[in-house]
Swiss-Prot record:
This is Ribosome maturation factor RimM. Binds ribosomal protein uS19. SUPFAM superfamilies: PRC-barrel domain (SSF50346), Translation proteins (SSF50447). The gene is rimM. It holds the Pfam family RimM. The PRC barrel domain binds ribosomal protein uS19. Its main location: cytoplasm. An accessory protein needed during the final step in the assembly of 30S ribosomal subunit, possibly for assembly of the head region. Essential for efficient processing of 16S rRNA. May be needed both before and after RbfA during the maturation of 16S rRNA. It has affinity for free ribosomal 30S subunits but not for 70S ribosomes. NCBIfam families: 16S_RimM (TIGR02273). Belongs to the RimM family. HAMAP family: Ribosome_mat_RimM. One of its GO terms (cellular component) is cytoplasm.
Amino acid sequence: MEDFFSIGQIINTHGVRGELKIYPLTDDINRFDDLDSVYVDNEIKKVISVKKQPNKLILKLEGIDTLDEAVKYKNKYIKVLREDAVELKEGQYFIKDIIGCNVFDENDKDLGEVYDVISTKNNDVYCIRKEGQQDILVPALKDIVLKIEIENKKIVIKAVEEWLES
């Protein structure tokens, strides 16, 4: 099974020539500039053009040339293969890789599993759930998140009592 990343959602059509209005699901809208092809509904589509608008993009894909054809793709996701994803800087991670990680504090106490990541203007927030306990929201800050081991699906954070008090 291929490993895909959703980078945008088709929210509507644009015009009558098969263009698609895209809501980007990436924090770097410029990543669309270098796309040669994308996957929509498990079909590979060549990118013909990309136009940027405030908070959205207009994408023209090969083989979608009419309004009727474009309508079929409404609410679908634009995806790329992991190998074609933007290369991250050290200390950056894909949300898809963070979700499912087990979280421990520095005393090796099991706090649960990351089930969601909330992206805010200042930083991400990891949503952690452990059965029978209240969910924990952890700001993804360097002084709180001490270690992330994606290959081991493990995150180590500062003891909750230490950072909740400050």
